[in-house]
Amino acid sequence: MAISTFSIGDLGYLRNFLQNECNWFRICKKTFYREYRSVATSSPIFSLKNKPKKYCMHCEMVVLKRSHEFMFSLAVNGIHFGQFLTGIMKFKKKQVAEGLCYYVLELGSISPVDLSFIPKYNSDCVTSMHCVTPELIYENCSIVCPEEASRLTVKGLGDNKLIPLGGCGVWCLKNGGDLYIYAFVLAYDLYVACYDKTIFPSLAKIVFDMIACDSEDCVFCKDHNKHVSQAGHIVGCVSNQETCFCYTPCQKKMTDINNPELISLLCDQEINKIDIMYPEKKASLSLDINSYVHGYLGDEPCALKCVNWMPIRISSALSRLIILSCPVCKRVVMD
């Protein structure tokens, strides 16, 4: 079997994709080999040459060890892609909760190699990991205190610059190789008492559900079907799993409220318009939701209830799972 031709650029893009865009789940561990699987969203830097673009990248990797080197065979979307050699290969375990863990891959430089055979990939094997649920997110987050918030930059230059993820009141912090989601979410007691347990009640989600348009052709309000399974259960694209943060309505300024049932979570008054706000000058993270969204009754502004909301930081292990399962959030963070 001849070694496929890969340019230096091709190998660099592949290495970047495998390390930074894939969450790996271990499928098989044997004495002489291990097998891992990743279900990733489409990549802005890596694709299969001469193949139609796929919104889901199902990657299967069989790893062999020889002396002080590692060899791995890679298949993408059911097609054997190539075999590669590297001197450094580490799978760093990320434990989200009992029953939900995955691995982040660290690779040295890679080069093509010919193993003279193609291993059998366990394409039909399904991971047994637990799903990401709203309850799991609450269990894996911390409340942001004023001291921490003062060190986070929402607008302007700063060491801890938050990246807006698109929705109202949600950001990502890149800290070395770790990702952290910061968001405003409904207080836990209110979630337990009066909210749908299958949906994570972020401020971004609540505001989105209040003002999203009804057009089936709107790519902002309706086009949410290019996610992938956060725990690798399903090969192929899935709809937003209601635990993402990519809720960006097409209209943000002085928009009519279409779903008044949620108003009481934001305000005691019967507001009829929402205005999503963005800081215009250098600012650290405010813990007041009125800094990011205003309610209006006609033209009169109404104060929103901060007591119903809490600012949180989601653990890095869970944040990475959520962000990399969403094509929108992933691209925003990678840019």
Swiss-Prot record:
InterPro entries: Herpes_UL16/UL94 (IPR004286). The keyword Mitochondrion does not apply. Plays a critical role in cytoplasmic virus egress. Participates in the final step of tegumentation and envelope acquisition within the host cytoplasm by directly interacting with the capsid. Upon virion binding to target cell, a signaling cascade is triggered to disrupt the interaction with the capsid, thereby preparing capsid uncoating. One of its GO terms (cellular component) is host cell cytoplasm. The keyword Membrane does not apply. Keywords: Host cytoplasm, Host nucleus, Late protein, Virion, Virion tegument. This is Cytoplasmic envelopment protein 2. Signal peptide: none annotated. It comes from Human herpesvirus 6B (strain Z29). HAMAP family: HSV_CEP2. Its main location: virion. Interacts with cytoplasmic envelopment protein 3 and with the capsid. It is found in: Virion tegument; Host cytoplasm; Host nucleus. Belongs to the herpesviridae cytoplasmic envelopment protein 2 family.
